[in-house]
Amino acid sequence: MEPSILAVRLKRLLENMIRTSSQDSGRQGVLARYLEERLRERLPPHLWPHLEQEVSVPGLAREKKWDLGLVYPAGSSLPKKPRLLISLKSILKNPSGSWPNRLDDLVGEVSSVQLLFPEVVVGYVVVLDYGAPTKRRGGVYRPPQGNELDPIYARFKQGLAALAQRRPPLWAQGLVEGC
């Protein structure tokens, strides 16, 4: 598919996602389907059946449902192993209070699964709403003024960059592959 068509489609999808209530647990489903389609275009056909949404994978602490996962082999005599796992996150409300929690989520989710499956590749897709309402004193939410969220999102991106450096020789748990 033409890159410009993909960009327009992704933009519309994200705009709709941002307009959806931050309390709607299914709001990221459209993004998961989009990513699944993009991955299928790049995977060999014999792996397509193993790419699923909402895939349950054991972790050291507990089982987690990953938004998108490539888990194979799927034969009855062979144990399933996650090869690629993708977690979708969004910050659509109160970014100043949410971004540290998203980084903590990342480290916890990734460490738990990497301790059991150290070779797994983990992706972390985050949607940031630069117009997200921010909690003010007294618990009142209001839209940001100008570029006031820029420093908050810059710190979040720095935190993600610090965690996105999993490559030889740095294979530590809690890190993800960078792009």
Regions found by a protein language model. Give the residues of each.
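Phosphate/oxyanion-binding active-site loops and adjacent basic polyanion-contact surfaces
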Residues: 24-32, 61-64, 98, 102
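Short coil-to-beta-strand
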Residues: 5-6, 77-85
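Alpha-helix termini
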Residues: 43-44, 73-78, 113-117
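Conserved catalytic cores of phosphodiester-cleaving nucleases, focusing on short active-site segments
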Residues: 68-70, 82-92, 106
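Acidic, metal/cofactor-coordinating or nucleic-acid-engaging core segments within structured domains
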Residues: 94-179
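A short acidic, glycine/proline-enriched capping/turn motif at secondary-structure boundaries
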Residues: 75-76, 91-93
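Acidic-basic catalytic patches of nuclease active cores, encompassing PD-(D/E)XK
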Residues: 2-55
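Active-site metal-binding core of divalent-cation-utilizing nuclease and nuclease-like domains
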Residues: 48-79
